[in-house]
A protein has these predicted regions:
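Active-site neighborhoods and metal-handling regions in enzymes and metal-associated proteins
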Residues: 1-317
Length: 318
């Protein structure tokens, strides 16, 4: 595993275009995207430092020894001033880009040391590149989605067996592991009855009863790429009102998919689904965006919402 030169060159090109001479990447997913290495350092600092002049470093604690990465690795002790050590390798007097998750305790220390003339949130540089999926990435995501489909197919018959929502999540993990996934891509939402009205319900010890709608918001991770899906099923019987609403949502889904063509804007896709639900009298209950981008993380930069005027592309996966 080593630095992906093609991806690195695209990042460096974007840095030059935006006048950012030095970039600090701390997001583990973005570091993984560029280096093939995912490290969870907990509260400790890890930074992939990129310089348009080519002086790249990966700065990380000694507790996390790294293999050959195609970039020099700089280690610090837990008792060291890790930011000062990072700063010692940086050039002074330039605009510095940091990513959106770098903790203030590190950024403020870097500013105190007077390294840069300006500091900006430069997550967009890697985010924009990650948004464009290669053919290989698309294939990996198809495989993850197919596995997720199989997992959902095996989970649905269990909704009427008396398991609690939490137990259903455990059953789903067993299913994923048996199918060859690495695990959940996010904590699953299994919601029976009234709980299903909460888009981000925290699964609890509730059990289902005849007539309940059951929301299954589930996803797995396979070979480093995520799947995410939401399905609604019913236990035993379906009321006329529930059937009507289900069909409205399904038609809105179809209209959104039909609108998702290259050249359209993401807000057009959102509107295609939202306008139909509003037309049918349920617009006030559509409280969320239509979709979000996905890849190495289950929620990545980019979404299908009413304010996203970016153009749809075959290489953007939502």
């Amino acid at each position: 595993v080593t630095m992906d030169q093609n991806k690195l060159n695209r990042v460096l090109e974007s840095m030059k275009e935006t006048g950012i001479e030095q970039l600090l990447i701390s997001d583990p997913a973005s570091i993984n995207y560029l280096t093939g290495r995912y490290v969870n350092c907990m509260e400790r600092m890890q930074v992939l430092y990129l310089d348009v002049e080519g002086n790249h470093k990966f700065v990380i604690g000694k507790l996390f020894p790294q293999p050959e990465m195609g970039v020099e690795v700089i280690y610090f002790d837990d008792t060291e001033d890790c930011v000062a050590k990072l700063a010692s390798y940086m050039r002074k007097g330039t605009k510095i880009g940091v990513d959106k998750i770098w903790p203030a305790k590190f950024l403020l220390r870097l500013m105190e040391l007077g390294v840069g003339t300006e500091y900006i949130n430069a997550s967009f540089i890697v985010d924009n590149i990650r948004q464009i999926k290669s053919a290989e990435e698309q294939d990996l995501m198809r495989q993850a989605s197919k596995l997720n489909d199989l997992g959902c197919e095996k989970l649905i018959p269990l909704v009427s067996k008396g398991y609690t929502e939490l137990e259903m999540g455990d059953k789903l993990l067993e299913i994923y592991l048996e199918l060859g996934a690495e695990g959940h891509s996010f904590e699953p939402i299994i919601a029976y009855g009234d709980n299903a009205a909460d888009p981000h319900h925290e699964s609890d010890n509730s059990t289902g009863k005849v007539g309940d709608a059951v929301v299954l918001d589930i996803g797995c991770i396979k070979d480093g790429y995520c799947a995410d899906m939401t399905r609604t099923v019913f236990i035993g019987e379906v009321s006329d009102e529930a059937r009507k609403i289900y069909e409205i949502v399904l038609e809105a889904n179809r209209r959104g998919i039909a609108a998702a063509k290259p050249g359209a804007r993401y807000c057009d896709v959102d509107n295609a689904a939202r306008d139909y639900i509003t037309e049918m009298g349920y617009g006030e209950y559509f409280t969320h965006r239509t979709g979000h981008n996905i890849g190495m993380e289950v929620h990545e930069y980019g979404d299908v919402s009413g304010i996203n005027e970016n153009a749809v592309s075959y290489t953007h996966l939502t």
